């Protein structure tokens, strides 16, 4: 068994691309198969090496590893051989229409209430007419002549469907500049590298019928590939996700402090009957079943991802977060703040609270109380019992009770109305910092 993820390096991958990569990698891991990373860089104008590098970085950060990888730009000779095979069999034919001419034809067919598909006019050109067109400086592009039959697709998600090739335009496989399009390159790669299962987006379902037709024209067997087409992933507003919407790129989520475990766990089960839970890649793979994915479009909900990320953070051991903590942060710090951190990006704030510089709000009506508390502040060393001992002494001396004892002290020392347990924060702050903040807040 072999599966592949074949992104084009024309932008940063977003959660929609990542969902497909995760599905392929999990399915391969679940069934002991091979996972191939294929870079679809045949679009020479839009493909960028920087996006290839970003792709590798993002997938590695998500914990997705691949068994083999290559660029389609390194296999142009194989596509050229396939082109010659299709030309020799008469399935690939030259076309000379301009974009304007094609647009006029489409408009005319629409006016006649006919499907706006290609009319195959170039199939009726004689050899002399073709030679004359080339002599006049026209350079052909090349279309694949689809067969006149339906192509059945047994899909693990969508079920059985029929692609009516008669209602589809013969696809362009080679541009006038000689560039090979993905439609052909993908088929050649799948056949020659032994891909057995194709998991991709629902928007490729019609294209699957076309590619089956191309594969058979190149000598492929009927039923050579198993297919699973995942429903489209929509944004929160119900629109289609775009590579150019950077807010949901994997890079942006990483920079925002979302943990990769949360992203993979969320996307792996999005659109299925399984509730997302923070699981390792191996645990997700052990139970992964693409047949549990609903046929309906799934909506990416940032609130659900943040809720899952919160669970991940609250359970994370020190060893797993150590490298992402602010410099100098200890295990005691992490254990103190872990329950109040939803994203890695929030750690800097709490590190400043316990060991940096903050400006606590002045509490004019609590000044006298804070100075009384300062006078009762015990000497170090401090431990988890110090907060209780100190506030008990303050309560007894002032006659206060409940929130009126604790709240002014928390605000003075952290600048926050709520947060981690003060019994855990106090020893991390130290006597001098606590005393200074009490004086500032009492002004």
Curated annotation (Swiss-Prot):
ATP binds at residue 243. Pfam families: Anticodon_2, tRNA-synt_1c. A motif ('KMSKS' region) lies at residues 240-244. One of its GO terms (molecular function) is ATP binding. GO terms for cellular component: cytosol. Its EC number is 6.1.1.17. GO terms for biological process: glutamyl-tRNA aminoacylation. Keywords: Aminoacyl-tRNA synthetase, ATP-binding, Cytoplasm, Ligase, Nucleotide-binding, Protein biosynthesis. It is an enzyme of class 6 (ligase). A motif ('HIGH' region) lies at residues 7-17. The keyword Ligase applies. It is found in: Cytoplasm. It catalyses: tRNA(Glu) + L-glutamate + ATP = L-glutamyl-tRNA(Glu) + AMP + diphosphate. Belongs to the class-I aminoacyl-tRNA synthetase family. Glutamate--tRNA ligase type 1 subfamily. Catalyzes the attachment of glutamate to tRNA(Glu) in a two-step reaction: glutamate is first activated by ATP to form Glu-AMP and then transferred to the acceptor end of tRNA(Glu). This is Glutamate--tRNA ligase 2. The gene is gltX2.
